[in-house]
A protein has these predicted regions:
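Bacterial N-terminal signal peptides
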Residues: 10-18
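Bacterial N-terminal signal peptides that target proteins for export
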Residues: 1-11
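Short, surface-exposed patches at the edges or C-terminal ends of soluble domains, predominantly
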Residues: 21-325
Length: 325
């Protein structure tokens, strides 16, 4: 751990950073159009959205736009409120787990406190691992603390060690945190925010029209890989990025433990058995929301003009997961 420094005043200032979640509805004015759908309407692969584990992102809520985007591309999108098992996964081609949480960690004020308990049972993790080996594809998404702690066990099964922390861009100004959106841009060239993208078909797309030159995240978390995991880095955190490790999500001060995030990841992919897995350390990049806690009307996700390729990156990601890329 290291000192916060980097422009903080000497007083014990509670950081007014852009990490407060609060009420963030989806953007009613944003329509996730797809000019050239990959599949005819309702004929594509089945995408199952996990909603059985107190998920912060669901098709009816914060992932409404994501689900609409996938449907507009021809995917069949279904929500599941059943425990993960061979039966519940049988018809799914892609399983999306986004910001799951153990019931004991759910709070009305969203000031989540440690310890963070697992969101999944061993039987559920076993079922998912077997399903992936047999050809299923998993998209595991975890925002900042507390969500990494809740999915640590299932991530570990696939060789990923998730940090129960908040990730910060290299150009984030802690002394002027209020109103700072903390956006990290991952392209194939160096970026002032500290994001480093790794070449992969998810960036390249199927043709020139589907290239995603970059993808932008909004805070989130980070993870490292176990030795010989076989996991391929996709979104890497570079020089100047850092992590904060609060004991309570909305209680961050100059004394909050912190560390460099250099070399850690916000995105990675894995081919295991007949299946595929993608790990993403930020959820809003796949959404389209309004984050008034940053500034009135602030657009967070694929609706943000400074994240022009997030929609295409999202489509490419699901094409890769469904073996259509």
């Amino acid at each position: 751990m290291e000192s916060l420094g980097r422009g903080l005043a000497s007083c014990a200032l509670l950081l007014a950073v852009a990490v407060s979640i609060g009420a963030q509805p989806y953007d009613n004015d944003y329509t996730p159009t797809v000019d050239h759908p990959t599949f005819a309407k309702t004929t594509g692969p089945v995408v199952l959205i996990d909603e059985a584990h107190n998920n912060y992102h669901t098709c009816e809520g914060r992932y409404k736009v994501l689900c609409e985007l996938l449907e507009n591309d021809g995917f069949i999108v279904e929500s599941s409120k059943s425990p993960l098992s061979a039966k519940s996964l049988k018809k799914a081609d892609v399983l999306v787990i986004a910001n799951a949480l153990n019931a004991q960690n759910v709070t009305d004020d969203e000031n989540w406190k440690t310890p963070i308990l697992p969101a999944f049972t061993k039987d559920e993790i076993d079922a998912v691992e077997k399903w992936v080996a047999g050809g299923g594809s998993l998209l595991l998404i975890s925002d900042h603390m507390p969500f990494p702690g809740a999915i640590a066990d299932i991530a570990s099964r696939f060789g990923v060690v998730w940090q129960n922390a908040f990730a910060f861009a290299a150009d984030f100004n802690f002394a002027k945190a209020k109103g700072n959106p903390n956006m990290i841009n991952f392209g194939l060239s160096a970026d002032a925010s500290g994001g480093i993208g790794h070449a992969h078909p998810i960036f390249q797309g199927r043709n020139a029209a589907s290239v995603a030159q970059s993808v932008t995240s909004f805070t989130g978390s980070a993870f490292r890989l176990k030795p010989n995991s076989g996991v391929q880095p996709l979104l890497e955190l570079g020089e100047g990025t850092m992590l904060l490790y609060p004991m309570a999500s909305q209680e961050q001060t100059m004394q909050t433990p912190n560390a460099s995030a250099v070399g850690l990841l916000q995105g990675a992919v894995l081919e295991q058995g007949e299946g595929r897995v993608a790990f993403m350390g930020e959820a809003a990049m796949f959404a389209a929301r309004i984050a008034a806690f940053i500034s009135p009307g602030f657009k967070m996700g694929m609706n943000n003009p400074d994240a022009p390729y997030n929609k295409q990156f999202t489509l490419n990601l699901f094409h890769w997961l469904s073996n259509n890329l």
